[in-house]
């Protein structure tokens, strides 16, 4: 049975736009099958900059199915009074950040993503 925190998070995302603040939930991983990182950004108004961002990572397992991470994400959203949630339906790239974790165009750790479009996973180069 699906954990209640995971269920609540998915339900919030399905509800659509309910007002501001808005939370964005994006999943990242070493490939298209395992999400090792989730990042949540908070926007307080339309066309505004992201006010805060937080991420969660796992060395093993998948962040999309971890009830503890789902609970912490919900608590983070509640602390910011989030009314709307948008969530990616797939992994959208490498969990490492260009310019922070590595220099250059492609992550040296995640060979899978080399030459791939981060949103589709399709090879572009």
Positions of predicted regions on the chain:
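Long, charged N-terminal interaction/targeting segments
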Residues: 1-77
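Cys/His-clustered metal-coordination modules, chiefly Zn-binding fingers
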Residues: 75-125
